[in-house]
Amino acid sequence: MRLMTKLGFRALVASCLIAAGAAANAQVNVLITGVGSTQFPIATANFANEAGLPQQVTSIVRADLARSGKFTNIDAGSTPVPETASVDLGAWKAKGANAFVAGSVNREANGQYKVNFILYDTVKQQSLGGLSLTATDTTLRTAGHKIADYIYQKLLGVRGVFATRLSYVIKTGNRYQLQISDSDGQNARIALSSTEPIISPAWSPSGTKVAYVSFERKKPIVYIHDLPTGRRYMVSDQKGNNSAPAWSPDSNTLAVALSLTGNTQIYTVNANGGGLRRLTQSSSIDTEPYYSPDGRWIYFTSDRGGAPQIYRMPAQGESAGAAQRVTFTGSYNTSPRISPDGKLLAYISRTGGGFKLYVQDLQTGAANAITNTNRDESPSFAANGQYLLYATQSGGRNVLAAVPSDGSAPPQILSVQGGSVREPSWGPFMQ
């Protein structure tokens, strides 16, 4: 969340940084385009036997590849090509495609579908393998995302994130909704609907739970929502503010910011709500904890130096080692997020009267702004570290945007109909 002046920093923390299943009506449309100077040309033929299906797997695969910004879809015509067909790879290379995809969707006796495909390298004139997936009416979209992930990894050498999920908060009128969607913003489901603010959703590393802060009881309380069952339970309802939940890499612990004894400090609590333990012992505001991927460190925001900056301490707390300042570019930095490989720090910096998303190399300390927007907040890395999702403002509305984490292309605004959207969190790889 964005924090303002030092006075505003304290006031906002004291109020838990207020800012703002059934199927969801509002859909976030996710698009990341223009990444890099070149895009990989690929032709994906219509999968055989798709007519009349509730979801067209071919369309999902093509859309995923296009919105990644890494691929150009070459027209493959309208004729279905099953994975068993003999393919003239030279002809597809002549049409400008460096890769070709063929596949089929077959309904089985039990009502499920068998989705098969094969990926070809038309330049080397060879198969790059494929998958055979089982799907239902409701998971055909997931099958399409998994196929796109396979293609992305085989051709680019990086694991794809199309089969991951997003969480975010949409405010329409006086109602807040915590929504969970596919990575393309489609298939959105409502996890919680309330007339009180919902903030700080955070995915568990397993991808099966989302922690968040709800004000439904007129004060900030940390909950965990179990996605497979739809059940939720309270994790932290201490005196004062309970805010900023962050999962440990093993999913057993949450770091939280509590004002239990006055100034907000960093604590840990077991995922079942027990074992509360204080980690920071400062007279300042310590908030927004975030674990490093290896579990050794907790990064956090503190004004102990006079203005908000990002620090890190051992995961066991300051009793195991003094906190060290990490950010030195800019006089006001908040909202730390660490890339999945542990090499990059994303944060929000106050710059020229606005707030911009920065990325810092943790080894060299070099930090650069990677957006052209000016009201940025709540950064979240994709599971492969290639992209960052964040909240910002456009046209007077709260929106989400996505940008390559290396800043190689300008951010793309993600649209949502009928409401303002913020508090994004990009989920992990699905197991």
UniProtKB/Swiss-Prot annotation:
Pfam families, sorted: PD40 (PF07676), TolB_N (PF04052)
Function according to Swiss-Prot or TrEMBL: Part of the Tol-Pal system, which plays a role in outer membrane invagination during cell division and is important for maintaining outer membrane integrity.
NCBIfam families: propeller_TolB (TIGR02800)
Extent of the signal sequence: 1-26
SUPFAM superfamilies, sorted: TolB, N-terminal domain, Tricorn protease N-terminal domain
Family of the protein in this entry: Belongs to the TolB family.
Name of protein: Tol-Pal system protein TolB
Cystine bridges: none
Subunit structure: The Tol-Pal system is composed of five core proteins: the inner membrane proteins TolA, TolQ and TolR, the periplasmic protein TolB and the outer membrane protein Pal. They form a network linking the inner and outer membranes and the peptidoglycan layer.
Ranges where the record places region Disordered: 411-431
